[in-house]
From Swiss-Prot:
This is Large ribosomal subunit protein eL30. InterPro entries: Ribosomal_eL30-like, Ribosomal_eL30-like_sf, Ribosomal_eL30_CS, Ribosomal_eL8/eL30/eS12/Gad45. The gene is rpl30. Keywords: Ribonucleoprotein, Ribosomal protein. Transmembrane segments: none annotated. It comes from Dictyostelium discoideum. GO terms for cellular component: cytosolic large ribosomal subunit; extracellular matrix. Pfam families: Ribosomal_L7Ae.
Length: 112
């Protein structure tokens, strides 16, 4: 069993890496634009909020499997993911196309 402190620390660590991606990298926020990047084969990592509806989640995972892209389930809900990205709105799906200065791709074992 993982302690609450360790989970919170790893969530803060991912949050700081996400903030660096938003500042120095390239990403797409939202369901439709994420599907576009997956179909084009540009995505390197997909982040999904924990409260994403299952039909959308399965569709994104299907396209990610076809394009051999890593999918990471964010431990917080869409409000938490939006806050971690520095946005004042909810974000359920995020596609990272270029990580910039962040090492989030290696930390979450995505393709570089």
């Amino acid at each position: 069993m993982v302690s609450v402190k360790k989970v919170k620390k790893s969530q803060e660590n991912i949050g700081s890496k996400l903030a660096l991606v938003m500042k120095s990298g390239k990403s797409q926020l939202g369901y439709k634009s994420t599907l576009k990047t997956l179909r084009a084969g540009k995505s390197k990592l997909i982040l999904l909020a924990s409260n994403l509806p299952s039909i959308r989640r399965s569709e994104i995972e299907y396209y990610a499997m076809l394009s051999k892209t890593t999918v990471h389930l964010y431990s917080g809900n869409n409000v938490d993911l939006g806050t971690a990205l520095g946005r004042h709105y909810r974000v359920s799906v995020m596609s990272i196309t270029d990580a910039g200065d962040s090492d989030i791709l290696t930390a979450l074992n995505a393709k570089a």
